[in-house]
Amino acid sequence: MRPKVVFVLGGPGAGKGTQCARIVEKYGYTHLSAGELLRDERKNPDSQYGELIEKYIKDGKIVPVEITISLLRREMDQTMAANAQKNKFLIDGFPRNQDNLQGWNKTMDGKADVSFVLFFDCNNEICIERCLERGKSSGRSDDNRESLEKRIQTYLQSTKPIIDLYEEMGKVKKIDASKSVDEVFDEVVKIFDKEG
């Protein structure tokens, strides 16, 4: 069985992680966060990629696509090997640019099906406020204003065009993410009840 994938996109602080946790609970998807996989890999002393990832993340740059895809693929393979029924994945924070998308299409063509793109649309200032709030407790080195402004720039320049591309293919489900967590999830539920 091929994995069924929903790409989850939106700026930093749009609430992707929070909503993904709820989707997992309600619909039995497996949540893969590209950023989390990279951060875990960076901490793994045996990783061949650790130092390289560290450098990219520190500079607020996007990690080379081969690394991200190999981590995503490894997780999907392991999940499905453990339980063949678990073939539905939310991939959060990927693809982040043209290079990511081309890498995915080249590597995963015929190996995974992208059902749709869940796009959490949120204004930048709200996103920044949320991240700064989160930074107080998350200990994430990139939850500071300077790093955030860089991340939002990167997102606008690189990820937004990807969303537009999927939009043309009729694959984008857009949600106003500036509302409360519950209101946003109500919208999410409408989409997943229809799309599965």
Swiss-Prot record:
In-chain residues carrying the UniProt-annotated modification N6-acetyllysine: K43, K55
Subunit note: Monomer.
Descriptive protein name: UMP-CMP kinase
The family this protein is said to belong to: Belongs to the adenylate kinase family. UMP-CMP kinase subfamily.
Pfam families linked to this entry: ADK
Gene source species: Sus scrofa (Pig)
Cell location: Nucleus; Cytoplasm
Modified residues (Phosphoserine): S33, S180
Region spans: NMP: 33-63
Xref: NCBIfam families: UMP_CMP_kin_fam
Region span, LID: 133-143
Cofactor list: Mg(2+)
Primary residence: nucleus
UniProt cross-references to HAMAP family, sorted A to Z: Adenylate_kinase_Adk, Adenylate_kinase_UMP_CMP_kin
InterPro entries, sorted: Adenylat/UMP-CMP_kin, Adenylat_kinase_CS, P-loop_NTPase, UMP_CMP_kinase
Residues reported to bind CMP: N100
Cofactor remark: Binds 1 Mg(2+) ion per monomer.
